[in-house]
Amino acid sequence: MERKEQARQAIEEMVHRETRAWDAQDAAALVALFHPDAVWPWPPTERDHDPTSWIFVMGRFDRDRWTRSWQQLFATHRLVHNRRAIQKIVVTDEADGGFAVVDVDTLWRDGQGQDSHWHGRACKVYTRMSDGEWKLIMHTGLLAY
């Protein structure tokens, strides 16, 4: 199998691993996906396509801080549904990086019945580490298209 196809399959599997981690509410599995230098900018709303308004909710990847944040979410919310669909995967000619465009429709409900709906399209950027492992290095917040 050619290197680019292997990379495409590895990135597809990374998306599926992330989906399974959200489904299982497994914070350890989620943080295992991230590169140590990962960043995750968020638009204030799914309609804010202009990056000049974007923010960082959790800062640069910090395993402990991100784990605690997701554990708090899982402790206070019930996952109603988590639907994800890969729209496109692009791999570099060198097969050392790529991105996946993923449509997300995830609904959480807290103990008071308040919903938190994650809905939109994300660009998830991956890099192949020197040991061959793939890591998520950048992820945009969800945008409506």
Regions found by a protein language model. Give the residues of each.
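Short, low-complexity N-terminal intrinsically disordered segments enriched in polar/charged residues
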Residues: M1-D37, G113
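A solvent-exposed, acidic/Ser-Thr-rich amphipathic alpha-helical stretch
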Residues: A27, V31-E94
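Short beta-strand segments enriched in hydrophobic/aromatic residues
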Residues: F34-H35, W42, V104-T106, T140-L143
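Short, solvent-exposed loop/turn segments at secondary-structure junctions
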Residues: H49, L107-R109, Y145
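Hydrophobic/aromatic beta-strand elements that line small-molecule binding cavities or substrate pockets
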Residues: R84-V90, V104-T106, R121-T127, G141
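Flexible loop/coil segments at beta-strand boundaries within sensory signal-transduction domains
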Residues: T92-E94, G111, M129-G132
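Short beta-strand edge/turn micro-motifs at domain boundaries
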Residues: F99, H117-Y145
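Short, cysteine-centered beta-strand-loop-beta hairpins and adjacent loop/turn segments enriched
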Residues: L107-H117
